[in-house]
Amino acid sequence: MEYLPLFANLRQRTVLVVGGGNVAARKIQLLMRTGAHIKVVADDLCPELARIVNKKDINWIGKLFEPAMLDEVFLVIAATNNTKLNALVYKCAEKRHIFANIVDKQSYCSFIFPSIVDRSPIVVAISSSGKAPVLARILREKIETILPMFIGPMATLVGTWRNRIKQHIHNIAWRRRFWETILNGRFAHLISQGKWEHAEKEIESQLYHYQSPIGNVALVGAGPGDSGLLTLRGLQLMQQADIVLYDYLVSPEILDLVRRDADRIYVGKQAGKHSMPQAEINSLLVKLALQGKNVVRLKGGDPFIFGRGGEELQAVAAAGISFQVVPGITAASGATAYAGIPLTHREYAHSVIFITGHQCDDSSNYLNWSLLARSNQTLVIYMGVIQAAVIKKKLLAHGRALQTPVAVISRGTLKDQSVIIGTLEQLEMLTIQALSPTLLIIGEVVKISCEINWFGKIIKEQ
């Protein structure tokens, strides 16, 4: 983030604009909507600025800029075609720690103007950090078509009820949930129909019948990593959460989509490294929900595929707590799709089997290796890097060919995705450089990746 979006209260604050042309006029017209006390410094004014000055809406200083003019100024804008003057304004402002914007000279800007959608008091600001102003304008136009004109008056009406709601509902999280119910329900529908009195009565009715909320748990699959693969329902619940418990496999891009004010607890589950035992996670989910909170349990991939989501919900259900499940795209589906490897194919694989490397211990008889070694199927192994030698040994012993195609996919669907292709004979070598998380794909379908890979590069070992 190159620029932090801030909303400045300019009411009754002094803003100095250096320049009297059309560009300065456009900036001043925007500033006038904020209630700022505006001074313009210029030896001459364009017709529009002259009209504004004549109406006594702004103060005109008809002389050359002097550094002393920045005294008692909150921020300054320079919009002249004199590069030396613009530079002087910026340097003087910097020396006084005053925000400055030099039009069309980004290196001389301590703040920049965004594209604005004004539905006051709702204001949306869009910025490209000065890189693509036309793109920012196009985005603004799209948002203009989405936001109804009544959204501003609706926000004003809601504001008149805030103190009363605070007095009635003291818990911040419960109060937020009350407003979510109001704004997503009949109230908003009545506003859209222009029935303002009925809408206000709806708030009053909801408040009169208000009861303390009951907590719940949402088990949400975050998908394999790419934030674009998160489900819409998962995003909605993450935006409504009071608290989120998340794992190691949840990408930073996904976490950025969680509601800003939601508490976050890392319960990192990584092969051999559990920051919190499973029993404690189960207990924590129950404890938080019993406090009346909206709890989101966020897991990488799909929570019901090697995610122990079932165990967690058994504990929640046993406590009588309401819950729901939002499936996610499991790593086997997401990572192989991004690597151009179809899990099934009419010519090469009629079935697919998912297992984890934890089950592949050399001394374990848990797995049916004869079944896993069959041809015409795809074998996907989660967390299999540590057991690569055992996997190779077992599959070869039960009939899989040395030249069976193998893919090692690390950090699937992410920008730094790595796909290394070789054969079963090379499996241990292929996994040496693998970054976590890693999937092993074993089967003839791997050959197709060279034809339909579309994301990132594939390294083919000889």
Swiss-Prot record:
The modification Phosphoserine is found at residue 128. Keywords: Cobalamin biosynthesis, Lyase, Methyltransferase, Multifunctional enzyme, NAD, Oxidoreductase, Phosphoprotein, Porphyrin biosynthesis, S-adenosyl-L-methionine, Transferase. InterPro entries: 4pyrrol_Mease (IPR000878), 4pyrrol_Methylase_sf (IPR035996), 4pyrrole_Mease_sub1 (IPR014777), 4pyrrole_Mease_sub2 (IPR014776), CobA/CysG_C (IPR006366), NAD(P)-bd_dom_sf (IPR036291), Siro_Cobalamin_biosynth (IPR050161), Sirohaem_synt_dimer_dom_sf (IPR037115). Residues 1-203 are annotated as: Precorrin-2 dehydrogenase /sirohydrochlorin ferrochelatase. It catalyses: uroporphyrinogen III + 2 S-adenosyl-L-methionine = precorrin-2 + 2 S-adenosyl-L-homocysteine + H(+); precorrin-2 + NAD(+) = sirohydrochlorin + NADH + 2 H(+); siroheme + 2 H(+) = sirohydrochlorin + Fe(2+). NAD(+) binds at residues 22-23, 43-44. GO terms for molecular function: NAD binding; precorrin-2 dehydrogenase activity; sirohydrochlorin ferrochelatase activity; uroporphyrin-III C-methyltransferase activity. GO terms for biological process: cobalamin biosynthetic process; methylation; siroheme biosynthetic process. Gene3D superfamilies: Cobalt-precorrin-4 Transmethylase, Domain 1, Methyltransferase, Cobalt-precorrin-4 Transmethylase, Domain 2, NAD(P)-binding Rossmann-like Domain, Sirohaem synthase, dimerisation domain, Siroheme synthase, domain 2. In the N-terminal section; belongs to the precorrin-2 dehydrogenase / sirohydrochlorin ferrochelatase family. This is Siroheme synthase. It comes from Baumannia cicadellinicola subsp. Homalodisca coagulata.
